[in-house]
């Protein structure tokens, strides 16, 4: 009896920390190669790979899908899988770089992956925190699909609902938002130097970085070639201090 009790106590000691520690599940999607020849982008697949690499410094639960593998079916299946795996208190992080349209992102097979469908999966999950980064044209339209919930919802969007999102293939992250995001998560956004990056720190860094690059790009350009891009944050103020990265 004593032997059984000792074994049980040891088992509980091993199990308890696993159940108590919140986990972060990451889905990183990037599409540069679309069906046909007219829709291809520059380095969105690399955007997803680089984001996945950065997130692997925070968690080992990272799934990356790029280009031809990023069909609508595969994207939703992968998202459903991590939403199902996530338990109470866990966090889901989704990154997307590629084409966007009103109310959706666009898969490799040129199908609409609707924001409302992704939101349904997020809300059905037991996860407490939902953090998304969308580097896509018209990504600001997702705001209308954010429902009232007790979950901590945080969306970083590359542009307003009526704006295009810019890219530059000479960068490590081609998308303007992605470039700023990667630098910010690596510590550039840590304004108080406490080795943690919070939601509001990261957004302020991204917004300033992107708008400065847009201003530089527009300098000297004719009016018909000037562009606009203003990153957006969809988030309750109570989540501004949520820690997204630490080292």
Residue ranges: model-predicted function:
Residues 5-6, 13, 17-247:
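Cysteine endopeptidase catalytic domains of the caspase/legumain-like
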């Amino acid at each position: 009896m004593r032997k059984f009790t000792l074994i049980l106590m040891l088992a509980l000691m091993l199990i308890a920390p696993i159940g108590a520690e919140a986990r972060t599940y990451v889905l990183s999607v990037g599409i540069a190669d679309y069906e046909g020849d007219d829709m291809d982008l520059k380095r969105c697949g690399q955007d997803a790979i680089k984001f996945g690499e950065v997130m692997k410094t925070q968690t080992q639960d990272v799934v990356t899908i790029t280009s031809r593998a990023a069909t609508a079916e595969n994207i939703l299946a992968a998202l459903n899988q991590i939403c199902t795996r996530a338990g109470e208190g866990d966090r889901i992080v989704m990154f997307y770089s590629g084409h966007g349209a009103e109310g959706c992102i666009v898969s490799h097979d040129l199908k609409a992956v609707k924001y409302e469908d992704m939101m349904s999966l997020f809300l059905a999950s037991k996860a407490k925190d939902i953090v998304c980064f969308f580097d896509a044209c018209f990504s600001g339209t997702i705001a209308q699909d954010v429902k009232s919930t007790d979950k901590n919802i945080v969306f970083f969007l590359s542009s307003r609902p009526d704006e295009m999102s810019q890219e530059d293939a000479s960068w490590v992250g081609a998308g303007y938002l992605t470039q700023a995001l990667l630098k910010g998560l690596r510590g550039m956004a840590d304004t108080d130097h406490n080795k943690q990056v919070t939601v509001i720190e990261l957004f302020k860094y991204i917004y300033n970085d992107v708008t400065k690059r847009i201003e530089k790009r527009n300098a000297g350009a004719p009016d018909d070639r000037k562009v606009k891009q203003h990153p957006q944050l969809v988030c309750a103020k109570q989540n501004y201090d949520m820690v997204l990265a630490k080292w």
